[in-house]
Amino acid sequence: MKDLLCDISAFRYWRLPPQVRALCPPLPRPEEDWQRYGLVRNPTAAVVLGFPLYTLVRTRNKRTCPASIRQRLFLGELPRESVLETEHGFLITSPLLTAFIMSRHLTDLQLLLVLAEMCGLFAVCALPAALEAELTRAIDSGAISTTFGWVRCPSEDGAASNLWRRDALVLGRDLDRFCSDICGMRYGNRFMAVSQLVPLGAASPFEVEAYLLLGLPRALGGEGFCGIELNVEVTLSTSARAIVGKSRVYIDLLLSSPDGRRQVAIECQGKASHGRAGDGLRDADRMTALQAMGYDVLLLTHRQISDEGRFRAIVKAVCRMLDAEYRDKSSDEQRAETL
């Protein structure tokens, strides 16, 4: 019988690019390694996933306590399609079941960030130095392909970053279905409440952070802007196309006034490239092209959102552009910003 990985072990697996998974040897089967000596020496477990490994068991009498493994007990029926096969000798909980099990020991914000990454177009994966070197050798020698659907984003200095571009692991309909499956389960109500706040389709951690700061209700520490859209594709007019030499660009965050007449495009200037279609365009050109299309455009940086005064000025500027009234936060709303 194969191990069923869950919790942080499964989360680390789902963060692994396929290029890296291709380098990983399978785990030994428990019946062939009953004392788990082989598991301890296995590089996939020891280097990539890390000890202790977290596994899921379905009955109390199957719980054991080897030093290299910690077990999570899940009683009752599992959600649909929540256990998946891998090519590495073990089973894995689906991304959503992984997050649900992790929610037992995560804060609401931590759970929200986990779900935002799973529902986003990115993964954060920092590789150990030895694995990084092995990946480089394998790619340079042609031993593995680089066309696995995940693309590494460059940092500002052009070096490889820890940010990878990929398709979303979880779609909005997947999240809705999973929530219906866990309704009534322990921790289910909390998970469903957090899931209502998850941004879908964010292209970077910075986009998630900006979305939450602007879009969360004020009672939860945000600014309460409603209906924020992420990564909105804009087909350019002939004149705007001439500015950038492209037929389309993407708006990181699009805010609209309640009546829909005014819109503000926010471009997140992160430390690593988003890696989307349209990358390589100079920010000034993209900004000018969007302005030619009638959008008000703001550039947002880490430094700006980290400084309370600067961020407050940006929020007020957005309100002016949307013809909305800015209201100072109450003491309770200010306290929520620190939670």
Residue ranges and their predicted role:
Residues P154-L339:
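Surface segments flanking catalytic/ligand-binding clefts of nucleic-acid enzymes
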Residues M1-Y187, L339:
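Short gly/ser-rich loop at a beta-strand->alpha-helix junction or flexible surface loop bordering the NTP-binding
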